[in-house]
Amino acid sequence: MKPHPTPGRASEQLTKEDCLEMFRQLYLARYFDVRLIKEKKRGRLRGTLYSSHNQEAIIVGSIFGLRPTDWISPVHRDMPMFFMKDMRAGWRNPDRMGMSIEEVCAQVWCKSGSPGRARDNWSHIGSLEKRIIHSTSMLAGTIPVAAGVVLADRLNGGDAVVLTFNGEGSTAQGIFHEAINYAAIHKLPVITVVENNQWAYGTPVQLEVPTEDVADRAKGYGIPGYIADGQDVFDVYDKVMEAVEYARSGKGPSIVECKTFRAYGHGDHDDDRAAKYRDPHEVEEGRLRDPLAICRRRLIEKSYLTADDAIRFMAEGKSSSEATTEDFPPEVVAYLDEGIRFALASPEPPAEEGGMWVFKESE
């Protein structure tokens, strides 16, 4: 990995409370993943799950420093991002600019009143009020939408930036070029975060990108390309905040490549161990650099965590089947449990709604 130099690291300005909050959010993202996988294996969930295991540092570090008025456009592996946006304002703060855990759990359980109206169990949702752009299955398809959103914001005198998240495979799509080219010409504050987990479903990165670093694509547009260690929440925070300041100052878009590794198959329908398209040794090596363990080590070095505190919760290094509730802080378990209880108690969608919300209803 060739790290991009970051003058004046933004993470050095974080308080002890900020750093510990990041640590808790990493655990929350991991527990969300662990719990949902367990629920699916018990037959309590429908649809497909896309695990964010091993990629939590990108979810937490990239949005931690955003303003409430900034926009995000998550991809399918970023499900916790929907309820983690603006979480620094308070996990239970009803006024924060992020979805509630109840809304997201209702979405996952396909319940009536969920953001997706039970049409989908995963990430094809959004909220204009909360400044979360609706996601799409079309690779790189949200980048031009993100460009349009911040163009409108700029025309209205705003100073918001947008983070649009994509896998490395999406950078091989034509719309990726068209959207970033347009954003570069008009200096739009679009930050394209590329979650390079080395695999686009079953296609390795070297068959998608001809260069060693995806961030090199930025050179063709005359914009910055940053490279972050996607396992280190503080490095992700630093690189994204540098891109945010660049964009907010009116200089335009950038690409932030977060190098990470996909812990499991593409989704729970893809048993890559049975398909054998990934080397088991490569998978084992990729899982060794757990973002929770890296953050824990950094906090101990800063004396923000004592030795006793550091061993209280040990979810890192454990697979979803191995981890238990005892491996997670009680406030994390309680928060997600509230959302799940709400979802389970919510009604199923009535059959008569099946034809609704397909087209815009007339006034």
Language model features by range: what are they?
Residues 76, 258-260, 358:
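A general secondary-structure junction signal
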Residues 2, 23, 113-115, 181, ...:
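Short acidic/polar alpha-helix capping motifs at helix-coil junctions
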Residues 1-58, 64, 266, 270-363:
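Conserved acidic/glycine
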